């Protein structure tokens, strides 16, 4: 027997996506991917005050050389965030009172040996930045500056650094209720393969994995005076 149950009016589910902004982002991303001959790219536009995602584009290069939307890389790809993670590292040290914006680091010629491995700034071949303060370290995205500070102040207690990251919820999923959402992987000192080099390299965005949308949400919270929020959809009551 087939039971036919009539629908009942409920809330309307509305997307936060702005079609015009989506088109602009798609073209901009595709053009840049072609210019760089890149394999995959993501572009997300978020409204600061509400955290609403106004545009989200995920492009992957196919076998025919063209770019297509194949998966939601922005929420599912577990990527090393690289230099975008430096802000979080500096914020932890600032909040713990370990440094101030004027704290200076001698980055030397742009190369610093750390536990037998070379930490390099991007301009090491031009002689590095020499002595610079924390503000300048962030401005020029100095690998040496950030890693030196975090290693200096947390090498005896790496868990305190990890706890600082967790205070900012950077290790938490966004709970978007969308299939395939990835959960950030922030390594702790009690885990396997947490070597002496892990902390300095982790501080500049390596040896850790975070989906792109999570990094955007973190920066959006900074712009939004510390309020972290993200939304793909919202509900509205049905009109009568």
Give the label of every model feature segment.
Residues 1-42, 62-65:
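Extracytoplasmic/periplasmic proteins that interact with beta-lactams or build/remodel peptidoglycan
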Residues 2-4, 17, 43-78, 82, ...:
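Beta-lactam-recognizing serine transpeptidase/beta-lactamase-like catalytic domain environment
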Residues 236-240:
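A short, hydrophobic C-terminal helix/tail in secreted or cell-surface proteins
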């Amino acid at each position: 027997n087939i039971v036919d149950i009539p629908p009942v009016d409920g809330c309307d589910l509305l997307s936060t996506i702005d079609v015009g902004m989506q088109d602009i982002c798609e073209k901009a991303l595709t053009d840049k991917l072609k210019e760089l001959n890149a394999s995959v790219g993501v572009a997300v536009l978020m409204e600061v005050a509400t955290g609403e995602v106004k545009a989200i584009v995920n492009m992957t290069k196919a076998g025919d050389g063209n770019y297509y939307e194949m998966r939601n890389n922005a929420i599912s790809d577990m990527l090393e965030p690289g230099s975008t993670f430096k802000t979080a590292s500096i914020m932890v040290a600032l909040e713990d009172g370990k440094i101030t914006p004027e704290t200076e680091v001698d980055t030397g010629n742009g190369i610093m040996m750390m536990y037998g491995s070379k930490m390099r700034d991007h301009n090491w071949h031009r002689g590095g930045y020499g002595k610079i303060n924390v503000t300048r370290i962030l401005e020029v995205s100095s690998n040496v500056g950030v890693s030196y500070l975090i290693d200096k102040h947390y090498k005896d207690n790496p868990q305190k650094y990890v706890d600082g990251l967790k205070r900012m919820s950077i290790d938490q999923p966004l709970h978007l209720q969308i299939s395939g959402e990835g959960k950030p992987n922030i390594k702790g000192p009690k885990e396997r393969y947490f070597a002496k080099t892990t902390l300095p390299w982790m501080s500049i965005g390596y040896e850790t994995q975070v989906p792109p949308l999570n990094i955007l949400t973190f920066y959006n919270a900074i712009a939004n005076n510390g309020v972290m929020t993200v939304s793909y959809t919202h509900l509205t009551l049905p009109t009568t």
